[in-house]
Amino acid sequence: MKLFYAPGACSLSPHIALLESGLEATLVKVDTKAHKTEGGGDYYAVNPKGYVPLLELDDGDRLTEGPAIVQYIADRNPKSKLAPAAGTMERYHLQEWLNFITAELHKQFSPLFQAATPAEYKETLKEKIGKRFDWVAEQLKGKDYLMGDTFTVADAYLFTMLIWTKHVGIDLARWPVLAAYKVRIAARPKVREAMIAEGLIKQNDPVAA
């Protein structure tokens, strides 16, 4: 398999999932502004949507949306417990989380990274994200992970959103539960491995809040 990614982008989520699952995959770095792969290829030829992540399977089939990709990864190694079994209520709750993170968090964050987004609109988006964080923090009270005691692909996705906060001026100190959760996820060996591989942290960096 090949995972097409950009450092620190939402593709960090499936990158973490791959490492946690123990599955082997080749990483292909993408410059999402130039739409070029690290080898100089036209990324649009790989993914006409132009964004990451993209998972290319060994048979040439391709998946291009994060929630689909991470569930595919989880299902390839059920022993990893990265996703509950298909058809169970627990799986539907996982999908509920993935959909929430996609629609209510990820899509609110994206314009915050765009220089052309008006400052007033950015503040509106931050307020919306804050309200969503209020709710997520309530759900996490008394739990280590979104689904309880087990780390799942939903946690990898939420963690990715949380590390974005420092880049857009959102202070997690307002949500101690989320701040502690972020540190807890960041301390996982495979999460650190993914972040080191993407150049987000260095080998000897301490777990940062």
Q: PLM ranges: what are they?
A:
Residues 89, 97-190, 194, 209:
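GST-like fold's C-terminal all-alpha helical module
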Residues 38-42, 186, 205-207:
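Short secondary-structure transition/capping segments
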Residues 1-127, 137:
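GST-like domain detector, emphasizing the conserved glutathione-binding G-site
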Residues 35-37, 182, 202-203:
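Generic structural signal for helix capping and beta-alpha/helix-loop junctions
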Residues 23, 170-172, 200:
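Helix N-cap/coil-helix junction residues
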Residues 31, 153, 198-199:
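Short, solvent-exposed turn/loop segments enriched in Gly/Ser/Thr/Pro and often Arg
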Residues 196-209:
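Terminal-tail/helix-coil boundary detector
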